Amino acid sequence: IGNFNSESTYKPIDSDELKSILATTGRGYYIVAVLGAGQEPTNHALRDIAALGKDFDEWGRGIVLLFPNEEQYKKFRPQEFPGLPATITYGIDTDDSIRKEIVQAMNLNNSILPVFIIADTFNRVVFVSQGYTIGLGEQLMKVVHGL
């Protein structure tokens, strides 16, 4: 349904060095999201994913959850979402470049978060979701099981 460059870089929370999505997730499929910390659509999405945390862990692929900036990340409280998969890497979307790339490639509204995609390292996007989505965890899993 579109393209996303898996060589796009972000700043992992535990590092000052930029890292590519590909270097984080390895080859194959992965999930990338740009979140709005403390915003209800993002909280809802994270609760949906946490509810299926075991399924995502079994899938075993990388999930990269990005925040627009450090300030947003500091507002994030992972303990509010027990059950989030262990395969998550948190980071900062430096210069807003990843969100911009997804929004442009998928013709999405520029200002609405969260944005989730499932893509592969051949840069093919197979799923996209933006804003408030009921049952996002189930939708993601449905696509994952179809891969």
PLM region descriptions:
Residues 30, 37-84, 97-103:
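Structural microenvironment flanking redox-active thiols in thiol-disulfide oxidoreductases
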Residues 2-30, 37, 47-51:
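A short beta-strand-turn-helix
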Residues 34-37, 66-69, 93-95, 120, ...:
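Active-site-proximal beta-strand/loop segments in catalytic clefts of secreted hydrolases
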Residues 23-26, 57-58, 83-84, 108-111:
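Extracellular/periplasmic catalytic domains that process cell-envelope and extracellular macromolecules
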Residues 12-14, 87-98:
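Short acidic-hydrophobic, aromatic-tinged amphipathic segments that line or gate anion-handling sites
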Residues 31-32, 116:
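Hydrophobic beta-strand anchors of alpha/beta hydrolase catalytic cores
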Residues 85-89, 104-117:
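Structural micro-motif
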Residues 111-147:
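Thiol-/selenol-based redox modules, centered on thioredoxin-like
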